[in-house]
Amino acid sequence: MQIFVKTLTGKTITLEVEGSDNIENVKAKIQDKEGIPPDQQRLIFAGKQLEDGRTLSDYNIQKESTLHLVLRLRGGIEPSLVILARKYKCDKMICRKCYARLHPRAVNCRKKKCGHSNNLRPKKKLLK
């Protein structure tokens, strides 16, 4: 059967598939035609993102249906740098009066506006 894949640029790609084809196969066919790696592709049908392990028939995709192709966001940070960033940003003390960020072993606030308060708390940890 024939299905259509529409990109965000408005370009429509025609693919020859079977209902038993899984989503990974469809993404591989898109890669063959357009050169977009499957790990960067997200396919949407009827407002739902299609999961790799499922088949076209699981989503009730019929002949001449239109799928929408969007690309994953690029960027991010290397995993080893995430750990370093969390440590750098979280190992601080916070003044409860003026909310100043202080070094981890601080006993008193360094700001004059709170009277160099000793009312400090540890900075809350970031969630994953």
Curated annotation (Swiss-Prot):
Keyword Nucleus listed: yes
Cross-linked sites for Glycyl lysine isopeptide (Gly-Lys) (interchain with K-? in acceptor proteins): 76
Pfam families, per the entry: Ribosomal_L40e, ubiquitin
A GO CC annotation given for this chain: ribonucleoprotein complex
Keywords noted in UniProt: Cytoplasm, Isopeptide bond, Nucleus, Ribonucleoprotein, Ribosomal protein, Ubl conjugation
Top-level division of the source organism's lineage: Eukaryota
Keyword set includes Cytoplasm: yes
InterPro entries per record: Ribosomal_eL40_dom, Ribosomal_eL40_sf, Ribosomal_zn-bd, Ubiquitin-like_dom, Ubiquitin-like_domsf, Ubiquitin_CS, Ubiquitin_dom, Ubiquitin_ubiquitin-like
Transmembrane segments: none
Crosslinked residue numbers (Glycyl lysine isopeptide (Lys-Gly) (interchain with G-Cter in ubiquitin)): 48
GO BP annotations listed: modification-dependent protein catabolic process; protein ubiquitination; translation
Annotated SUPFAM superfamilies: Ubiquitin-like, Zn-binding ribosomal proteins
Domain Ubiquitin-like stretches: 1-76
GO MF assignments: protein tag activity; structural constituent of ribosome; ubiquitin protein ligase binding
Homology family: In the N-terminal section; belongs to the ubiquitin family. In the C-terminal section; belongs to the eukaryotic ribosomal protein eL40 family.
Extra information: Ubiquitin is synthesized as a polyubiquitin precursor with exact head to tail repeats. Some ubiquitin genes contain a single copy of ubiquitin fused to a ribosomal protein. In D.discoideum there are 9 genes: ubqA: 5 copies of Ub and a final Asn; ubqB: 1 copy of Ub and ribosomal protein eL40; ubqC: 1 copy of Ub and ribosomal protein eS31; ubqD: 3 copies of Ub and a final Leu; ubqF: 7 copies of Ub and a final Asn; ubqG: 5 copies of Ub and a final Leu; ubqH: 5 copies of Ub and a final Asn; ubqI: 4 copies of Ub and a final Asn; ubqJ: 4 copies of Ub and a final Asn.
PANTHER family given in the database record: UBIQUITIN
Protein name per UniProt: Ubiquitin-ribosomal protein eL40 fusion protein
Organism the protein comes from: Dictyostelium discoideum (Social amoeba)
Gene: ubqB
